[in-house]
């Protein structure tokens, strides 16, 4: 029947997670939260968190952070946009926090990463 809820159907679960991931990929620059996404897809926070991790292989915050950092690297490759502006463009209001997340994920801060790209001719 077409009335199965997201918790009752494996296909529906995969579909809502796929839709949520696509939404994040598109709106990564918005202030996305677990509670906001859970509300959007009409599920409890704990359920959203559990099935997102199961289907995507990483938790929501890591997925969102990775998506934002990948987008930031893309902007770095496109030109000389100010790093604080790039941080804002990918959804970070606080450059210090962006720097911390970037460093944690990439092993170096955004400034060093950009310098390494220039040295490598990227």
Describe these PLM feature segments.
Residues 40, 89-90, 105:
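Residues within the alpha-helical elements of helix-turn-helix
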Residues 100-122:
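…primarily DNA-binding HTH/wHTH and HhH modules…
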Residues 21-22, 26, 31, 54-93, ...:
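Terminal helix-turn-helix DNA-binding modules in bacterial transcription factors
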Residues 1-19, 26, 35, 40-41, ...:
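Short, Lys/Arg-enriched, Trp-marked, Pro/Gly-tolerant hinge/linker segments that flank
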Residues 35, 46, 82-85, 95-96, ...:
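Residues within helix-turn-helix
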Residues 47-48, 52, 97-98, 102:
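Short hydrophobic/aromatic patch on the recognition helix
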